[in-house]
Amino acid sequence: LTPRRSGQVTALRTGQVHGEPGGLAQTCVSAARVLPQDRPDTTSWAPRTAESRAATSRPTAAATPGLPGVVGSPAVRPPGAAHLTDAQVAELGRELDAIRDDVLARRGASDAAYIRRVIRWQRRLELGGRALLLNARHPAAFVAGTAMLTVAKIVENMEIGHNVLHGQWDWMRDPDIHSTTWEWDFVTPSRAWQNTHNDLHHRWTNVVGKDRDVGYNVLRMDESEPWRPRHLLNPVINAGLAPIFEWGIALYDLELDRVRTGEKSREELMTDLRSVGVKAARQFAKDYVATPAVAEVLTGSGKAALVGTLLANGLRNIWAHAVIFCGHFPEGAETFSEEMVDGETRGDWYVRQMIGSANISGSQLMHFMTGNLSHQVEHHLFPDLPSSRYAEVAPKVREICARYGLPYTTGPLLRQVGSAWKKVFRLALP
């Protein structure tokens, strides 16, 4: 029980307002389910002072390479930021810290209501889509059911799953919407994705030799990689990857390249293989066994329901592939050498995220359907802020880029997709 000086109390779970100013507010921590320890924050911000380092269990830059330090400078700054002095980089970092702190100070009930509303809407859409596919032999039901299921899967992966797994909603302390408990509608297990995406890609964004997302070990996506004859297949591999993107990511997350180099043991690989096998079996049973089987029993629509589910997954994969490739591969997004991050400060880390990422311009609906990854620059600066806040901070980030003479890469979806594909074709050649 805690006395309130003013204002009212809103229950985050229900949105209901309780009590009058001056009364007592009671807070309850559920003992029915205990949340595991929060994941270490390796994707957003490092402690700012000696006092904050002493007060947190987060690893420091000195202990964990790839996390930004407080003072110093990298051995070499990237070309796009070579004109900045150490003092300017430090001030830029403080300005971006202030933007983040402002959002954190105002984050609350409306944000919680937003994500719960999206989750409810997505689940109803998925249920409706699967229900229509139970009668998929009728063209109208087939088209509507496939469309609804496609959109539901896109929303679950992009706006919900990806962002929940970044810990954007961990502050709610809701066991059902937490980065340590959420399992998304994607073949690769959540924990595997968090390892390769959160812990590695966001830490080493576009650092050649560190960020495995630069080419995903199958594509040549940077001029510094020596050309080999197999790179002629760049466009073919990328086109084939798009419709089966979730399976490609599941294979990528196994880190077979690290097994070959001895960085990852075969025991670890077998553990990961079992995890992927269990997840893949569940996804296969849900999409390609349960829904078609029920449709066949009820209406004789089993084959049509199977085709509809295959289409929904394929279209989701193509969309996710397109959006993700727009994040770092369009013209204007820089890559970095290891010496450019050796000794980088907090401000330098911010600079790298800004000039190594690319946005997509468009409508509010388009931003939502990309999971707000259309605000890739803002997402890489603040990956643990609610995605619904990126549109709010984007003008401030763009103004900072302009004031410090840094590029802010953005453009319409088709232009960014075309730019990424142009790079795929260009780097297929010597």
Residue ranges and their predicted role:
Residues 4-16, 20, 26, 53:
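Intrinsically disordered, low-complexity repeat/linker tracts enriched for polar/charged residues
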Residues 18, 38-41:
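Intrinsic-disorder-associated, low-complexity terminal segments enriched in Asp/Asn/His/Tyr and depleted
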Residues 45-48, 66-94, 233-244:
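Short, non-transmembrane cytosolic segments of multipass membrane proteins
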Residues 72-124, 128:
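Low-complexity, highly charged intrinsically disordered N-terminal segments
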Residues 113-157, 232-247, 273-322:
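Alpha-helical bilayer-embedded segments of polytopic membrane proteins, i.e.
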Residues 151-272, 341-428:
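Membrane-embedded catalytic scaffold of the fatty acid hydroxylase/desaturase
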Residues 275, 296-297, 307-345, 425-430:
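Extended hydrophobic/aromatic segments used for targeting, binding, or gating
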